[in-house]
């Protein structure tokens, strides 16, 4: 049973927006460059991957950085650009003991496409 709780739960962008309005917090795991081009209102940016000279690599300080913004029992919705990084980030957070995390299907691309509130 405990193993099942480590399987990420995913929600649509419309459900994610409703959760945000209900008090959940938005963790945007895109790069700072992507985040600066537009993000969901109120989102906190902690990159899951860093862009370096040799391409993208996992942020070794991701869990520590997330922990500086969120508690392990906080309700968090996790998004990236299209869903690939956020599902991995959500899985890592669950394995690290975060209990209220949900992945956003389609990420920021789907969020913006659905006309949900954004900020540049």
From Swiss-Prot:
It catalyses: thiosulfate + hydrogen cyanide = thiocyanate + sulfite + 2 H(+). Its EC number is 2.8.1.1. It is an enzyme of class 2 (transferase). It is found in: Plastid, Chloroplast. It holds the Pfam family Rhodanese. The active site is at 80 (cysteine persulfide intermediate). Thought to act during the early stages of leaf senescence. Catalyzes the transfer of a sulfur ion from a donor to cyanide or to other thiol compounds. Substrate preference is thiosulfate > 3-mercaptopyruvate. InterPro entries: Rhodanese-like_dom (IPR001763), Rhodanese-like_dom_sf (IPR036873), Thiosulfate_ST/Rhodanese-like (IPR052367). One of its GO terms (molecular function) is thiosulfate-cyanide sulfurtransferase activity. Residues 20-120 form the Rhodanese domain. Monomer. The gene is STR16. This is Thiosulfate sulfurtransferase 16, chloroplastic. One of its GO terms (cellular component) is cytosol. It comes from the Eukaryota. Substrate binds at residue 85. Keywords: Chloroplast, Plastid, Transferase.
């Amino acid at each position: 049973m405990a193993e099942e709780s480590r399987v990420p739960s995913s929600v649509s962008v419309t459900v994610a927006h409703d959760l945000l309005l209900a008090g959940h917090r938005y963790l945007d795991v895109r790069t700072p460059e992507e985040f600066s081009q537009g993000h969901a209102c109120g989102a906190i940016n902690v990159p899951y991957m860093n862009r370096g000279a040799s391409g993208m690599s996992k942020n070794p300080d991701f869990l520590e950085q997330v922990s500086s913004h969120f508690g392990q029992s906080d309700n968090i919705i996790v998004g990236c650009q299209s869903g690939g990084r956020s599902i991995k980030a959500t899985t890592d957070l669950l394995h690290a003991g975060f209990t209220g995390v949900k992945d956003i299907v389609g990420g920021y691309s789907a969020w913006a496409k659905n006309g949900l509130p954004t900020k540049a």
